[in-house]
From Swiss-Prot:
Annotated Polar residues bias: 1-15
One example GO MF annotation: structural constituent of ribosome
One CC-aspect GO term: mitochondrial large ribosomal subunit
Protein name: Large ribosomal subunit protein uL2cz/uL2cy
Organism of provenance: Lobularia maritima (Sweet alyssum)
Gene name in the database record: rpl2-A
Subcellular location: Plastid, Chloroplast
Length: 274
């Protein structure tokens, strides 16, 4: 991804660093509208997730996470911007006439061919089961449950690594540093998700953040006691507690929130690093 820096005519352009423009002209049969999606409110209009709201209207693009068009070659026709994720997407024209969107693999260009199946080449963008991949392969869009579609390593720049295969399971090292077991029959896509430099962007102004549907974040220490446990005091005061807490009084910043009896607890060999 190319980062554009503009001449300093206004404060917003002086501090901004945005990616090069990738146009989006989605196909009508691969999109649908969403009503109040991502606004952080429930059915009664009550805020359930803070710091969300507003933003530009979006159309959801149907992404093929399953990659179940087996042994049918497809060609990358366009690389488009998707407002619902930080990764780009590709429009694929398959040999049987079907058209689908997939996540854009890093390095893929218009005109490249991809295929999914059991005995396909280990090539960027191809999807195949983990049992057919050599050790050390970089992968993304990884299935957890067979046939459900990819659920792991789907963000921009995400990449996992196949480090071992034993019995019915394969050992993966995920982008978070977690090492876990997954069935060897689950499929994944070879390569890394594109738009790697997304974390180098700087929006430059608050208005650009509002367009994305992100509301301002206010520190609890500057609130009143009625609004946050950290609030109150004369002037710039400390939080008045040994450890920070959430707005509802629960421990924050370091408290483990994962359920101990979750079914996948035995599949995680090493916990993710913070």
């Amino acid at each position: 991804m190319a980062i554009n820096l503009y001449k300093t005519s206004t404060p917003s352009t002086r501090n901004g660093a945005v990616d090069s423009q990738v146009k989006s002209n989605p196909r009508n049969n691969l999109i649908y509208g969403q009503h109040h999606c991502g606004k952080g409110r429930n059915a009664r209009g009550i805020i359930t997730v803070r710091h969300r709201g507003g933003g530009h209207k979006r159309l959801y693009r149907k992404i093929d996470f399953r990659r179940n068009a087996k042994d049918i070659y497809g060609r990358i026709v366009t690389i488009e911007y998707d407002p619902n994720r930080n990764a780009y997407i590709c429009l694929i024209h398959y040999g049987d006439g079907e058209k689908r969107y997939i996540l854009h693999p890093r390095g893929a260009i218009i005109g490249d061919t991809i295929v999914s199946g059991t005995e396909v080449p280990i090539k960027m963008g191809n999807a195949l089961p983990l049992t057919d991949m050599p050790l050390g392969t970089a992968i993304h869009n990884i299935e957890i449950t067979l046939g459900k579609g990819g659920q792991l390593a789907r963000a921009a720049g995400a990449v996992a690594k196949l480090i071992a295969k034993e019995g019915k399971s394969a050992t993966l090292k995920l982008p978070s540093g977690e090492v876990r077991l997954i069935s060897k029959n689950c499929s994944a896509t070879v390569g890394q998700v594109g738009n790697v430099g997304v974390n180098q962007k700087s929006l430059g102004r608050a208005g650009s953040k509002c367009w994305l549907g992100k509301r301002p974040v206010v520190r609890g220490v500057v609130m009143n006691p009625v609004d946050h446990p950290h609030g109150g005091g004369e002037g710039r005061a400390p939080i008045g507690r040994k450890k920070p807490v959430t707005p509802w009084g629960y421990p924050a910043l370091g408290r483990r929130t994962r359920k101990r009896k979750k079914y996948s607890e035995t599949l995680i060999l090493r916990r993710r690093s913070k």
